[in-house]
Amino acid sequence: MYEGLPTRPDAGVWWSIVEKYKVTHMFSAPTAVRVLKKQDPSWLKKYDVSSLKALWLAGEPLDEPTAQWISDALAVPIIDNYWQTETGWPILTLANGVEQQTTRFGSPGKAMYGYAVKIVDESTGEELTGPNQKGVVGIEGPLPPGCMQTVWRDDARFVNTYWKSIPGRLLYSTFDWGIRDADGYHFILGRTDDVINVAGHRLGTREIEESIASHPNIAEVAVVGVADQLKGQVAMAFAVAKDPSQLATSEQRDSLAREVIATVSKELGAIA
């Protein structure tokens, strides 16, 4: 186990460990990879990482640009997986040890064995069975939430919080937005309370962040909602450039801002 920043003492520390100990499998978080994405790519080339067979990433949504970058850099399977502290093991992933399946960047995969994952309407509890319909990710019993059986010896609070938040049915709520495509791959869109209401349009921050992160000069981004007298809320993005030298002048910064806005408008619409 390595405990520390992926850039200390330098941005090659992960890869030096892989080379020294002939590491075959790694597990980390997407943020650590995004930190490395900002560094000089030559660090990865200084070490022999041929022993590495796969990289697992979890703990937060893995955006498609980051997944694509690390996949290209390592040329090994990048295995996203989605779970919660309460569940104790993955809800969504690709169990390639049982059945080989194609990775889709941006998706943690399909429901693990034993999990009956549903996409449901937050207002009615109706199950959304069509492809790419956005709803709350819920799970039928008895498997969830795994190791968690109550909340501070308050059984009623446990049931009301986790099992009765979706109207009209007893269903474990992950409190995450998600969609499922036509092939059964799930995409997690962020927390249900992490939503911006722009002129009556409910927008998930993760959707906006992933759109911005697709720009080649954006390494990291966070989106929050701020108050606006006209629209109620508007989205504000805080971004870290991959190459700050390209933003030395106000003209360059304005140009990047216009490019980012155009990217979001193209992918999500001008409302974002």
Language model region names:
Residues M1-I17, R202-I208:
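ATP-dependent adenylate-forming carboxylate-activation enzymes
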Residues W15-S16, V23-S28, K37-F105, A116, ...:
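Gly/Ser/Thr-rich phosphate-binding loop
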Residues E19, M26, P144, G168-L170, ...:
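AMP-binding/adenylate-forming catalytic core of the ANL superfamily
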Residues S51, A75, G114, R157, ...:
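Glycine-centered tight turns that cap/initiate beta-strands
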Residues G59, W83, G109, D176, ...:
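Active-site glycine-centered loops adjacent to acidic/histidine catalytic or metal-binding residues
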Residues Q100-S107, T161-I166:
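Short, P/G- and charge-enriched loop/turn segments at secondary-structure junctions
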Residues K110-G114, G125-K164, H201-L203:
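Conserved ATP/PPi-binding loop(s) of AMP-dependent carboxylate-activating enzymes
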Residues K118-G141, A182-D183, L247-A257:
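Conserved beta-loop-beta connector loops within the AMP-binding
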